[in-house]
Each structure stands twice: as structure tokens, then as C-alpha cells.
Amino acid sequence: MKIQENYFYKLDDLKEVKVIWKKYDKANILEIGVEYPTAIVDLDRFSGIPITKEWLLKFGFFIVKTNGLIEATLPNFRFTLNQVKDYNGFFFCENENVLMNIDYVHEIQDLFSAFLKRDLVFSDSVS
């Protein structure tokens, strides 16, 4: 898993944290700083946060439920995230074509950054 600054991950499978800085030695990450509680932690303590409807709402997505399907959209973003019954992640779609599965918060942050060249932000604090 690639660790990015300003992305959210799960620390020790317990607490959701935002990475605020990384320190490198050549190509290797030596230290990672996270906010609240401020700490320096090892890379192997991070895991992905499962993507949920609540996380998408924090990022400003609009959620619509119809016939067992959840569709998440953003203004001025031509792609949608769709979730079907009995699947925990979302399908990243263009029109009705599934482009890939999204299972974690950092994956939607990566996609958003790649397509729009800016970070996905939200106003709610992570608790």
C-alpha cells in the first residue's frame, strides 16, 4: 500500500488518522507523521480504511438509494461510485461501465487526485 500525505488510513486497525508528513532516506520511508494524536509511526502500522457511505458524505458526495443500489456522485465529476447489496466496497463507474472496484478511502483519494489534480477535502473532523 502506498502511503500519501494528506490521505487517511487506519492506524493499528483501531484509529483513523491523516498522514501529515513523511521522511525519506533515498527511496525508503523512514518516518510518518500523523495528526491527532500527533505521533511518528512505522509504515507497517497502517492499513486501509474501508470506504463507506459515511466517508463519501464527508468528502461531499451526494448519495441516492434506488432498488438496492447506492449511487454516489460529486458535482462536476462525470464518474459515479455505485454500491450493490452484499458488497462492502463501491464500483467506480462511467455511465454504466464499471472501471474498477474501490474498497478503501485512500483509493478514492488517489482517483480524485489523478482525475482532478487536487485533493479530496472535507470539513468534518475524523473521530
Regions found by a protein language model. Name each.
Residues 1-4, 54-55:
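N-terminal helix-cap/turn-to-beta initiation motif at the start of protein domains
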Residues 4-6, 12:
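Loop/turn positions that initiate beta-strands
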Residues 15-30:
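Short beta-strand-centered aromatic/proline hotspots
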Residues 27-34, 67-75, 88-95:
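Generic recognition of long tandem-repeat/solenoid scaffolds
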Residues 37-62, 101-118, 122-125:
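Intrinsically disordered, low-complexity, charged/polar segments
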Residues 55, 60, 85-94, 125-127:
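Non-cytosolic coordination micro-motifs
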Residues 59-85:
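Amphipathic, interaction-prone secondary-structure segments
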Residues 79-103:
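Intrinsically disordered, low-complexity regulatory segments enriched in Ser/Thr/Pro
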